[in-house]
């Protein structure tokens, strides 16, 4: 079984338990355990050398009982159907947790944009939209940025969809440049959401952010913004990593210096001679550990070595079920991904609302509304976990899936 098969299976297992605790029967689980629609497309792209290369793309729409589906599009060589399926299920949970009128969606293309020219990436982006255009739209399924996609790619996709639709459709996609209807604060919303989760977790442990020792795995979009936010709040960032290694300084790394040298793909460690391994990064003495890279990073093999008292999941699925159990038994407060990383989809929702009404908010208004939603969600999930004596992941799944299940029941789907 591949890692992505494991992600789907473990997610299904927790959803099943959550539905059982909510009193829903097997029929509801049968409906929710798989996406309602799973699209695979082939995208021919003329490369700069004149040859034509055909790429495989996916779009999953997990459940639209509540409303249109919502979720990012990632460009990565490891994208496959199972990963996209699992990610769409998590998006349903995130939307339920922060009370958004969406179901979960997700998309991806099997490619390595680091090995492509900007013109090739543009042609691929437009080709993907042409391939999925009948299945998406501002009231059907709304894409957004994800791994190795950004506001420029969203702009190309919006332009292509608008040409096909013969109507300017800014609400078709979120994460756009401000000038094309993007929202203030969207580019750093995922990281700010993680900061809010860290603040709430620290509050429960009577911990001050100022002076706290933090380790962040991943220095991409979310990881780098997160490092900067925490650095400015006075936290001591003692370890960061990227795809090539990790850096450690017990006295705290100079985050501004690293950000100045980071490339567009979040790489910085290759500029340094002295690095540590990913394994050593997770063993560092710290107060807060934030996995902000890829899935299955905290496992039963290294969960006993973690020294942090708080783990906040900024990445999707970084902790296996076995590791979750170990961390919980050790008394470590684990804030799950579906709560901690919900900032991105929340501000995407704000962008969609602003597009629909043609009235735009300041960054201060966006951040205030984001904080209000995420603090309320954290309070609800933490209180449920304490009252029922369950871990925060199961509590988050109970809150996250309840709305979709109730909407499906009222519609007569299960």
UniProtKB/Swiss-Prot annotation:
NAD(+) binds at residues 190, 221. SUPFAM superfamilies: Aminoacid dehydrogenase-like, N-terminal domain (SSF53223), NAD(P)-binding Rossmann-fold domains (SSF51735). Keywords: NAD, Oxidoreductase. It catalyses: L-glutamate + NAD(+) + H2O = 2-oxoglutarate + NH4(+) + NADH + H(+). The record marks 146 as: Important for catalysis. InterPro entries: Aminoacid_DH-like_N_sf, Glu/Leu/Phe/Val/Trp_DH, Glu/Leu/Phe/Val/Trp_DH_C, Glu/Leu/Phe/Val/Trp_DH_dimer, Glu/Leu/Phe/Val_DH_AS, Glu_DH, NAD(P)-bd_dom_sf, NAD_bind_Glu_DH. It is an enzyme of class 1 (oxidoreductase). The keyword Oxidoreductase applies. This is NAD-specific glutamate dehydrogenase. It comes from Staphylococcus aureus (strain COL). The lineage of its organism: Bacteria, Bacillati, Bacillota, Bacilli, Bacillales.
């Amino acid at each position: 079984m591949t890692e992505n098969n494991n992600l789907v299976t473990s997610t299904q297992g927790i959803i099943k338990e959550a539905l059982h605790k909510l009193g829903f029967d097997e029929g509801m689980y049968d409906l929710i355990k798989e996406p309602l629609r799973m699209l695979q497309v082939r995208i021919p792209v003329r490369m700069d050398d004149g040859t034509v290369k055909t790429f495989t793309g996916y779009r999953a729409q997990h459940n639209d009982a509540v409303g249109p589906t919502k979720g990012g599009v990632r460009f990565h060589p490891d994208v496959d159907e199972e990963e996209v399926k699992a990610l769409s299920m998590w998006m349903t949970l995130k939307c339920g947790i922060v009370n958004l009128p969406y179901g979960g969606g997700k998309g991806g293309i099997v490619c390595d944009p680091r090995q492509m020219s900007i013109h090739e990436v543009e042609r691929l982006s437009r080709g993907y939209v042409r391939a999925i255009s009948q299945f998406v739209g501002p009231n059907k399924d709304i894409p957004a940025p994800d791994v190795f996609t950004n506001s420029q790619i969203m702009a190309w996709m919006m332009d292509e969809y608008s040409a096909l639709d013969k109507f300017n459709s800014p609400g078709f996609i979120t994460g756009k440049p401000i000038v094309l209807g993007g929202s203030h604060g969207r580019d750093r919303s995922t990281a700010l959401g993680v900061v809010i989760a860290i603040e709430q977790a620290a509050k429960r442990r009577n911990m001050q952010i100022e002076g706290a020792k933090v380790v962040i795995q991943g220095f991409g979009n979310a990881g780098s913004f997160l490092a900067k936010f925490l650095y400015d709040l006075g936290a001591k960032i003692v370890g960061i990593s990227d795809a090539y290694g990790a850096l450690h300084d017990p006295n705290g790394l100079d985050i501004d210096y690293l950000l100045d040298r980071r490339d567009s793909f979040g790489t910085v460690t290759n500029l340094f001679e002295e690095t540590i391994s990913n394994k050593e990064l997770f063993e560092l003495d710290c107060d807060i550990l934030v996995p902000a890279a890829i899935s299955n990073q905290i496992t039963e093999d290294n969960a006993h070595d973690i020294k942090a008292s708080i783990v906040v999941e900024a990445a999707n699925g970084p902790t296996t079920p076995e590791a979750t159990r170990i961390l919980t038994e050790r008394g470590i407060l684990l804030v799950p991904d579906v709560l901690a990383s919900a900032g991105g989809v929340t501000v995407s929702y704000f962008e969609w609302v602003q597009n629909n009404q043609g009235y735009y908010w300041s960054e201060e208004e966006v951040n205030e509304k984001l904080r209000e939603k995420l603090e309320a969600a954290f309070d609800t999930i933490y209180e449920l976990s304490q009252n029922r004596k369950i871990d925060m992941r199961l509590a988050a799944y109970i809150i996250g899936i309840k709305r979709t299940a109730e909407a499906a029941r009222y519609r007569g789907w299960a």
